[in-house]
Amino acid sequence: MKFGVIGAGQMGGGIAQVAAQSGFDVVVHDQKQEFLDRGKGVIEKSLGKLHEKGKLTDAPETVLGRIHFTTDLQDFADCDLVVEAIVENQQIKNDLFKQLGQIVKPEGILASNTSSIPITALATASGRPAQFIGMHFMNPVPLMQLVEVIRGYQTSDETARIVTETAEKLGKTPLSCNDFPGFVSNRILMPMLNEAIQCVMEGVAEPEAIDGIMKLGMNHPMGPLTLADFIGLDTCLAIMEVLHQGLGDDKYRPSPLLRKMVQAGLLGRKSGEGFYKY
C-alpha cells in the first residue's frame, strides 16, 4: 500500500512517521518547502530518540528513506490511502478534498484526521463518499494507541474494513464511532478543557492548582490546561465551535477567555505561551 499524508505539521508528521516505521512508502505534502523541511526535522529527531531507546526496528535513515516530501498534490495520484491532517477549517478541507477526489486514482481511499468536523460533509466534497472515512489519530501519534474510525453516511463496508486493517498494521487500536460532531473523544474531552478554562476566568483557582487537582485527584496524567496548551488553544476553540454549532447546546459554548487568548495569539506551546510559558 502507498500511503499519503496531507500536512507536515505535528499530526501529519506523526502519521507519516508511524506509516514509514510500519514499512509503508509514504508521500507527505505541504504548501511550502519550509514546512516540509521543518516536519522532516521533527521526524528525524523523533526517530533518533526511538533508535537510542532501542524501540526502532529499522535504522532511522531507512525509515526516513520511505518518505517522499512534496509540494505537488499530483504526487498522490497513485496512493491507495490519503490521510488529511491540515488546519481545522471545513471550507479549506472541502477545497482540498475536491482536488484530491480528481487526482487520486479511482479506487483510492480518502480519509480525514479531523478532530470534530462531520465526515459526511467532507465526503460529499470529495466526490467519492463511499471511499471516504474519518481516521482520527491522537497526539502525539507515535506514542498514542487510539485511532477513532468514523464512517460517513455513505462510507462503504469495504472502505471501513481496509482502513481498520491499515490502522492495525500501524500498530494502533482502531475503535469505531458514528459521525457526530466531535465524535467520542473530543465530545467528552473538550468540554472538560473548556470548563477548566472557565474556572480560570472566574477566578476559581490558578492554572497550577486546577491542573494539580485533576492530576492528583482524578489520576489524569496531564492537567487540562497543560493539555489545552499542548493541543493548541486555537484548535480547542475550533472544536468547541463545531460542537456548539453542530449540537446546538450551550454547554458547548466556548469560554470567553479561550476566545480572547486565541485573539491575542496566546495559543499554547506552539506560540510559546498559553496558560503557561514555554
From Swiss-Prot:
<dbReference type="InterPro" id="IPR006108">
    <property type="entry name" value="3HC_DH_C"/>
</dbReference>
<dbReference type="InterPro" id="IPR006180">
    <property type="entry name" value="3-OHacyl-CoA_DH_CS"/>
</dbReference>
<comment type="pathway">
    <text>Lipid metabolism; butanoate metabolism.</text>
</comment>
<feature type="site" description="Important for catalytic activity">
    <location>
        <position position="136"/>
    </location>
</feature>
<dbReference type="InterPro" id="IPR006176">
    <property type="entry name" value="3-OHacyl-CoA_DH_NAD-bd"/>
</dbReference>
<dbReference type="GO" id="GO:0019605">
    <property type="term" value="P:butyrate metabolic process"/>
</dbReference>
<protein>
    <recommendedName>
        <fullName>Probable 3-hydroxybutyryl-CoA dehydrogenase</fullName>
        <ecNumber>1.1.1.157</ecNumber>
    </recommendedName>
</protein>
<keyword id="KW-0560">Oxidoreductase</keyword>
<dbReference type="InterPro" id="IPR022694">
    <property type="entry name" value="3-OHacyl-CoA_DH"/>
</dbReference>
<dbReference type="InterPro" id="IPR008927">
    <property type="entry name" value="6-PGluconate_DH-like_C_sf"/>
</dbReference>
<comment type="similarity">
    <text>Belongs to the 3-hydroxyacyl-CoA dehydrogenase family.</text>
</comment>
<keyword id="KW-0276">Fatty acid metabolism</keyword>
<dbReference type="GO" id="GO:0006635">
    <property type="term" value="P:fatty acid beta-oxidation"/>
</dbReference>
<dbReference type="Pfam" id="PF00725">
    <property type="entry name" value="3HCDH"/>
</dbReference>
<dbReference type="InterPro" id="IPR036291">
    <property type="entry name" value="NAD(P)-bd_dom_sf"/>
</dbReference>
<keyword id="KW-0521">NADP</keyword>
<dbReference type="InterPro" id="IPR013328">
    <property type="entry name" value="6PGD_dom2"/>
</dbReference>
<dbReference type="GO" id="GO:0008691">
    <property type="term" value="F:3-hydroxybutyryl-CoA dehydrogenase activity"/>
</dbReference>
<dbReference type="GO" id="GO:0070403">
    <property type="term" value="F:NAD+ binding"/>
</dbReference>
<dbReference type="Pfam" id="PF02737">
    <property type="entry name" value="3HCDH_N"/>
</dbReference>
<keyword id="KW-0443">Lipid metabolism</keyword>
